[in-house]
């Protein structure tokens, strides 16, 4: 199941850098993290769903690239984001 509009708006409001911000790295990573967590729950129940697993791996790679970009450009924002999302690194 895809992310609902309400949930996505809630995540955007929490991580946006300014009003109307939907494309900053923080927002993109936060939305991807929610989707990744949701897909992980699905994969735990449906172990043979290889198409979903592939989509999960693509989302993880996209999030990894965004986090690497943020780490290169602004280390403080990177540290704040991974601590607020509870990601390892």
From Swiss-Prot:
The keyword RNA-binding applies. CDD domains: Ribosomal_S15p_S13e (cd00353). Pfam families: Ribosomal_S15. Keywords: Ribonucleoprotein, Ribosomal protein, RNA-binding, rRNA-binding. Part of the 30S ribosomal subunit. Forms a bridge to the 50S subunit in the 70S ribosome, contacting the 23S rRNA. PANTHER family: RIBOSOMAL PROTEIN S15, BACTERIAL AND ORGANELLAR (PTHR23321), SMALL RIBOSOMAL SUBUNIT PROTEIN US15M (PTHR23321:SF26). Belongs to the universal ribosomal protein uS15 family. This is Small ribosomal subunit protein uS15. The gene is rpsO.
């Amino acid at each position: 199941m895809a992310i609902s509009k309400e949930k996505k708006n809630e995540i955007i409001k929490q991580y946006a850098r300014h009003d109307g911000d939907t494309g900053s790295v923080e927002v993109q990573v936060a939305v991807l993290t929610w989707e990744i967590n949701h897909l992980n729950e699905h994969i735990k129940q449906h172990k043979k769903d290889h198409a979903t697993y592939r989509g999960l791996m693509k989302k993880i790679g996209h999030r990894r690239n965004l986090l690497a970009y943020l780490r290169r450009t602004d280390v403080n924002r990177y540290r704040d984001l991974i601590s607020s999302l509870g990601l390892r690194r």
